[in-house]
Design a protein with these regions (language model features):
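Active-site and donor-binding regions of nucleotide-sugar-utilizing enzymes
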Residues: 1-94
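A nucleotide-sugar donor-handling region in carbohydrate enzymes
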Residues: 72-149, 181
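Nucleotide-activated donor-binding/catalytic signature segment of Leloir-type glycosyltransferases, i.e.
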Residues: 183-199
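Short acidic alpha-helix that forms the nucleotide-activated donor recognition element
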Residues: 198-210, 225-226
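Acidic donor-binding loop of glycosyltransferase active sites
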Residues: 208-219
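C-terminal "capping" alpha-helix adjacent to the active site of nucleotide-linked donor transferases
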Residues: 261-282
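A short, well-ordered alpha-helix in the C-terminal region of glycosyltransferases
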Residues: 283-297
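C-terminal alpha-helical cap of glycosyltransferases
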Residues: 296-311
Length: 311
């Protein structure tokens, strides 16, 4: 974002429970230009901390939980439910610029509007004759970096029970901290159609080649939307369920379930949903269309425009 906004100095500081005082942060900025702003993205800041910053400098806060009435100049909540959280009804935000909803999802450059893979998906959604959907593409499975419950492994084993699914290509995205990587690699050795991808740097490419994705709640859902990939979404953490449920409620994703509530049921429902979705071309097309309508890849650009307008 610094490259897009030469007039804006973004100081991204991961605060701890012993965070520096605002005065200490600002003192290190004294030699910089005066027409700058600070972008804060931390759960640890307090109302007092933000108020002190706001007195000295344009203060922007990234939020997703609405913990209290933040004394800031601009508030960004790019979640799909951001507009439903009631910020506008809070008198404390009367003079705060609010950037709410998925129009402001700041995706990485590979997912930005106009990128090659994204453009192909957009053409697909418009029915361009020269674009073919990834009907025989792989099934993408993404469950988070650590996947402590081995959801990917459980989903794969459930899928292998069905003739309609066991011959499909499966691409599992795994982080280096996954304690079950050995089990996944063992499955890949047993089934040549299972591929494990660690420390992925080409996520957009993997998504573009996917027929359907099985994904946990999180920012990956927005990336899948930008790529127009039909998705079956599930949750395994408390902060994921609202996001997943909102996607489902708006008809953008199919619901797999909540692992914390009933793990076996979530695994079975997700694979049952995959069987249904793979055989329903009309439903896949509808999910693609709604996904691309939600995320157009210009979120970072819109945030940049809003930030520059404050200078």
């Amino acid at each position: 974002m610094e490259a897009e906004l030469p007039g804006l100095l973004c100081i991204l500081q991961e605060l701890t429970q012993r965070a520096e005082l605002p005065e200490e942060v600002l003192s290190r900025m004294s030699s910089q230009r005066k027409d700058i702003a600070i972008l804060v993205d931390s759960y640890y800041v307090t109302e007092k901390y933000l108020a002190a910053l706001k007195k000295r400098i344009t203060t922007i806060y990234m939020d997703d939980i609405y913990a209290f009435s933040y004394p800031v100049d601009m508030l960004i909540n790019y979640n799909i439910y951001g507009e439903e959280m009631g910020y506008e009804k809070d008198a404390a935000f009367a003079d705060t610029k609010l950037l709410l909803g998925a129009n402001y999802v700041p995706l990485r450059e590979e997912f930005s509007a106009g990128a090659g893979y994204v453009q192909s998906r957009k053409e697909l959604s418009l029915g361009a004759a020269n674009v073919t959907p990834a009907e025989e593409g792989g099934i993408l499975i993404t469950t988070g970096g650590s996947d402590s419950f081995n959801l990917a492994g459980q989903l794969l084993m459930e899928a292998m029970k069905y003739d309609a699914l066991k011959e499909k290509e499966y691409h599992v995205v795994s982080g280096s901290l996954n304690p079950h990587i050995g089990e996944l690699q063992a499955l890949a050795k047993k089934h040549e159609n299972i591929h494990i991808h660690c420390n992925v740097t080409n996520m957009a490419e993997l998504m573009a080649e996917s027929e359907v994705a099985l994904s946990a709640g999180g920012s990956t859902l927005y990336e899948l939307c930008a790529m127009g990939v039909p998705v079956i979404a599930f949750s395994f953490a408390e902060n994921q369920e609202r996001l997943v449920q909102t996607f489902v409620k708006r008809g953008i994703a199919q619901y797999g379930g909540n692992y914390r509530t009933d793990g076996n049921k979530m695994i079975q429902n997700t694979i049952a949903g995959l069987r249904k979705l793979c055989g329903d071309e009309a439903l896949k097309t509808e999910y693609r269309r709604k996904a691309l309508q939600l995320v157009d890849g210009r979120g970072a650009e819109r945030i940049a425009e809003a930030l520059l307008s404050e200078q």
